[in-house]
Amino acid sequence: MKGHPKGLISAALSNMGERFGYYIMNAVLTLFLCSKFGLSDETGGLIYSFFYAGIYILSLVGGIIADRTQNYKGTIQKGLIIMALGYVVLSVPILATPENKAWLLPLTCFALFMIAFGNGLFKGNLQAIVGQMYDNFEADAAKQGPEALKEAQGKRDSGFQIFYVFINIGGLVAPFVAPLLRSWWLKVNGFIYNSQLPRLCHEFINNGTTSQNFLDEAAKAGADPAVLTQGGEAIGQFCTNYLDVFNAGIHYSFIASVVAMMISLVIFLANKKKFPTPTKKAASANAGYTAEEKASMAKEIKQRMYALFAVLGVVIFFWLAFHQNGQSLSLFARDFVNTDKIAPEIWQAVNPFFVIVLTPIIMWIFGALGKRGKQISTPRKIAYGMGIAATAYLFLAIFSGVMGYPSATDFRGMEVAQQATMKAGPWVLIATYFFLTVAELFISPLGLSFVSKVAPKHLLGLCQGLWLGATAVGNLFLWIGPLMYNKMPLWACWSVFLCMCLLAMGVMLGMVKWLEKVTK
């Protein structure tokens, strides 16, 4: 934490508040869409994919707006306000019925668009400001001599790792909020949380038929046995009441997201004057160059942008595999993991927990290698991260093959007793998230650092937006995960992601020497 720009922690705290609010919603989004509107896993996954992609695509728009207006701080401020308004819309508990679904689902999607657009204005531009902090930090160090400059340049990667840890502190706590509020509200109304029951309730409302599986799960959730024996209208009323209470508890959790946005806004406004303005610095730096120097700089800028786009093309495959934590991996936790007393959303807290614990260890390892003259370049670290991500899916593929897991659709067609004998222990998820988190720490914060190194000074917001845009492209195809999860044996599903990560690693390793040359 020592020897970094003074504004780093303030920016990280503002980002932490925003991420806390976001991860409250993100932890339950796919399951919420399915439980509220009775959507299939594939349809819920498709909405999630477009929302998640929108967050990062709109970061590109936010970067362009900030670069054009030269108003990074104002753009960030507006983003926080728009996100808060989106969460306000989501927090209103309206029971979804066949009559109002035609306008309620689009309203929910509009609220998600507001959150995505606000995030686009906020996310990349705050990262651009952090990058400018280190540009200024290195410029000041250069005035003190080569040794001071070398030491300052070595701080950038670790600075972005610190920034990343604060993001995940919010992500660690947030996944507990919605499940706790939902379970509390169910208990207040005489019900018990049951992850399978919302889907079964929607099936009854739509088809009017019951199964032994439905009756068993309804009894576990606190349904009156007399109601279950009456059938027809009585069971329909139970289903409506359970869905209403179940989803209202999630709606109330979005109020916490609104509060988190307001706290983030207060932190940002309190420290606004301390943050640098990237475009103004770039304009003053370019004022004294000759025509020849500007031509040479233009050639270098082209090389840097080529390098940036090359890395962006590779990391698309990583984000497609990694962000299955909100898609097929959450569904896997719900269906194939024995989590009777733990909501499946809670497992998303495992990743930020590992980020917080492992980041200091990885920073120490990189620092120790640097002191011995064996420093690993940022592009090579990213390539290694791809290989580590492949290890996570190799583990899942082997485990699923050994267990003989069918597709999720076939699994749900089995008797409850047979399902119970096939369910895995929680350690499977913990091991998977461990490998994915180590991979993330080799790629995400170091990718931000890489972008800040190669980005032209007058395009900082745009380039950070491009990095997030690559994430968006990967997120656009997240729906592939639930599709394969429901249609293919699980070993085959995980093997697809394994091959993606291995391919990305191979391509990245093939470009390492060129990328190292460009970044130097």
Regions found by a protein language model. Name each.
Residues 68-83, 368-387:
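Cytoplasmic membrane-interface "Motif A"-like loop-to-helix N-cap segments
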Residues 81-102, 386-418:
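C-terminal ends and interior cores of transmembrane alpha-helices
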Residues 25-43, 183, 325-347:
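Short amphipathic helix-loop junctions that connect adjacent transmembrane helices
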Residues 2-36, 113, 302-328, 349, ...:
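Pair of pore-lining "gating" transmembrane helices in MFS-fold secondary transporters
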Residues 46-68, 172-174, 349-366:
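Central cavity-lining transmembrane alpha-helices of secondary-active solute carriers
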Residues 27, 60-61, 92, 169-184, ...:
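A gly/Pro-rich, aromatic-decorated transmembrane alpha-helix motif that marks the paired
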Residues 1-6, 135-140, 147-157, 166, ...:
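Intracellular loop-helix junctions on the cytosolic face of multi-pass helical membrane proteins
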Residues 16, 86, 100-125, 312, ...:
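Hydrophobic core of transmembrane alpha-helices in multi-pass small-molecule transporters
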